[in-house]
Amino acid sequence: EDISTMDKQAIPDHTLLVGGFPCQDYSVAHTLSSSHGIEGKKGVLWWQIRDTIIAKKPPFCIFENVDRLLKSPAKQRGRDFGVILACLAQEGYSVEWRVVNAAQYGAAQRRRRTFIYAYRNDTIYGQKMADISADMIIKNGGLMAKAFPIQNIGQITETVIGGDIVDVSDNFAFAFEAAGYMRKGRIYTSKVIEQEEEPIALGKILQKNVDDKFYITNEKMPKWTYLKGAKKIPRTSANGHEYVFSEGPVAFPDPWDRPGRTMLTSESTLNRSTHVVSDPGTGRLRLLTPIEAERLQGFDDEWTNTGMPDRMRYFCMGNALVVPMITRMGRVLDTIIAEEK
């Protein structure tokens, strides 16, 4: 069912609301019918999440987004995340967030994502956290610090966000760091030094002697070599300005002794971001198999083998979360929810 057309009150009551949503334009304006109402851009999923929160008031929420959410848009850094925080504050929630690189916490992929944890202030957990300082919540007392331990935090910077979401959309800007906490509109944020764990090297997840269809043919090798290599290309912008587009080389093949790069939905297609590995059995260059793509994200082998074509299996994995990162948050949240009963 389309979340944008359904009655949010018809959604069953729930303890935890979970969502992943694109980094879109979160700007808002007052509605034409009311100076108190607000209206976001059509098709922006966040507003459906907000409406669900208003209708159902779940005690806990966990959201996921790309790491650039904290710095977007480029012309008003921090506005988009500020709008999200203002919406949650308005509904009586406190918020923790962390930008997590999965490889730093034992995963097989260097994938940076922003995780957002919100909880109602009137929960048992919310009342308990009200007595803990912001720096302690960021360093070791909050859900994020328990799920993703850190060695230390940097200097905390603070700001206050107002309750008028349109004003936040029009005027708010702030340098959000990789970790932070908000309660009742007061924001605290800092850099962190992660307590790094040994990642899984790419070589550990590779299969041997895979099907011939995954190997790069001699005919396509020059194209792959070009895409992966450094290049400088003269270009002309729409207004006639001439410039040189340049990019450095990408490891070709991808090294076995490091975790994989961030997997995209285009994985396995002929493009610069696709992983190319040396097969452990034959030594020939090839693409990842669907099973290896699943392993990069921490899924069980054959998780996506439902009859869908390989192209869609890669697409699903390029869109997925790194499962062990969610497991880490889930274990902490299990304890929190158990104490509410």
What residue ranges belong to the model's regions?
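Short SAM/SAH-binding signature in class I
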Residues: H14-G20
